[in-house]
Amino acid sequence: MTVDQVRSRRPASTSVAWLRPGRGVPLPEAEARERTVRRRVGIVWGLLVLNVVGYTGALVHIPGAFGKGITQGALPVAILVALTINRKIVLRPNVFLCLAFLLAIEAVITALEPHSFGTVYRTFRMVEFVAALWLLTPWWGRSDLLLVRCHLKALAVVLGSVLLGVLIAPNKAIGTHRLIGVLWAVPAAQVAHYAAVIFGVTAVLWFCGKLPSRVTLMIVSAAGIILIATRARTALVAMIAALLVAGLSLIVARARVRKLFAIAGAMTAIAVITLSGFLASFLARGQSSSQLTNLTGRTAVWGPLLSFPRDKFQEIFGFGLSNDSFNGLPIDSNWLASYEAQGLYGVVVCAIMLVFLLALAYFQPRGVQRALALFLVTYCLVASFTEVGFTGPSPYLLELALAASLLIPPATARYRH
């Protein structure tokens, strides 16, 4: 075959084909479009994660308004990017997002009462957040776990900034004996949350044979070290409970899960017998018995919150979205924060969201998607007693949405196109 004949067989135009990096082999048009969509979905999800990370400070001084503008401005940018791949605004029916939308609608109704600008603004952001999630529904239920991979990458970037902060300013990062983010301020509890989710999701993927053992060991080792360095009890307990539930859902079908549970049970028994004193001291973090009894001062806020006088409307619908504080102190409980912000209505809707996802997972066939969803929902359920986040844009609401995306079938051609 002559050179001219070879050239004649090449595509006449590169407008419908992209080149593979470093190969010079053109991609088919459909594959090129799919790659573009995957990248933009990843950008949207990364912007949603940036939005929920929030801004409380940085190693290099950034004006507060500018820092908050970066994180809060990520939400409308995420919607705009989502619209570039969902131009016809195709929305798949979804019960979970309907429940989240009910929370947003209730927040709008409550915001019509005389409130500060902050309440109205938080309500608007909640509506934006649910809208962004709904724009991504055509890519929910994918067998390639696209959104899970996007979530892991986004959390890895956050934890990467935490580790970089340890190298740059170790005294600030671990000066309080708890690992925090200093390059971009991330509290210890939030660092622990991200590390626990990466640890658990990676472990579940290994349970199902989706990751090789060597890669899994590297990831869970790094995430485990970060989690231990934060000395966060809630994240540790929630992760263990979630892994137990996810593992039990696979224990019949996966031999490696049965072996791991047997080994973990034996090691736990040995650790409890030989290291019980050290473990108790480590988890106590130097706190007294009274501090542990009142959950590090949380109950001192919960009592006055519940006894605060309310009229019938405020008891049912709450006072509107706030910064999850009461008298200037953090509430640190999703259920009490929901009661404060959206009343009994918010508490009931949050409970229905969790029950619906657990029931939906129960009727799914055994597999990686069901196990991942069970891990995420169980983690959020356990953490919800001492963490906040279901009634507003937060990592917990984002992870519940991720769990919901794993429990629905892939989109049909009608929604994909």
Q: What role is predicted for each listed range?
A:
Residues 31, 37, 342-381:
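Hydrophobic transmembrane alpha-helices and their immediate junctions
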Residues 375-381, 390-417:
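Transmembrane alpha-helices of multi-pass inner-membrane enzymes
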Residues 40, 95-102, 135-163, 208:
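Interfacial loop-to-transmembrane-helix boundary motif in multi-pass membrane proteins
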Residues 169, 247-289, 308-311:
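A membrane-periplasm/extracellular boundary helix in multi-pass inner-membrane enzymes
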Residues 70, 74, 96-108, 115-138:
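Aromatic-anchored transmembrane helix interface
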Residues 58, 282-345, 361-365:
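Long extracytoplasmic/lumenal interhelical loops at the membrane interface
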Residues 148-174, 186-249:
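Alpha-helical transmembrane segments of multi-pass inner-membrane proteins
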Residues 1-41, 85-88, 401-417:
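A juxtamembrane structural motif centered on a specific transmembrane helix
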